[in-house]
């Protein structure tokens, strides 16, 4: 299996989660400002909600790299506790990309909300999420 990890972040919360997932998968987590250099079977894509909205650059990244992505696995951080999975799934399907049925989300710190998150417990959960998917895929 060929994996990649890409993320969009403003605060650094999603980057922390992405780096931990990348560690499990043996790949470097990359900001979505960078194109995917090659085709991947599974792209773990991290994004965030800002004032209950996703950033449009995530959608543009998916469109631009659609030919290099087999399946997207979504993960997200948010001060509100909500997930970006529904949005990412819609973007994936619109571009003919499969969407993995399970996603990961954890709280992210923002101003007075969720200070210190994601914490070590959250990052361990992210690593376990990636390990479980690898195991399910027989990798």
Positions of the model-derived regions?
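FMN-binding flavodoxin-like domain, especially the glycine-rich phosphate-binding loop
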Residues: 3, 9, 13-28, 39-139
């Amino acid at each position: 299996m060929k994996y990649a990890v890409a993320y969009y972040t403003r605060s650094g919360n999603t980057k922390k989660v992405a780096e931990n997932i990348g560690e499990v998968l043996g790949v470097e987590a990359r900001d979505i400002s960078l194109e995917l250099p090659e085709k991947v079977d599974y792209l773990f894509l991290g994004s965030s909600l800002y004032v209950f909205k996703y950033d449009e650059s995530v959608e543009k990244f998916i469109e631009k790299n659609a030919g290099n992505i087999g399946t997207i696995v979504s993960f997200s951080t948010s001060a509100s506790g909500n997930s970006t999975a529904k949005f990412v799934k819609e973007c994936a399907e619109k571009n003919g990309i499969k969407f993995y049925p399970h996603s990961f989300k954890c709280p992210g710190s923002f101003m007075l909300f969720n200070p210190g998150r994601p914490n070590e417990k959250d990052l361990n959960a992210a690593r376990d999420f990636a390990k479980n998917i690898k195991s399910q895929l027989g990798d």
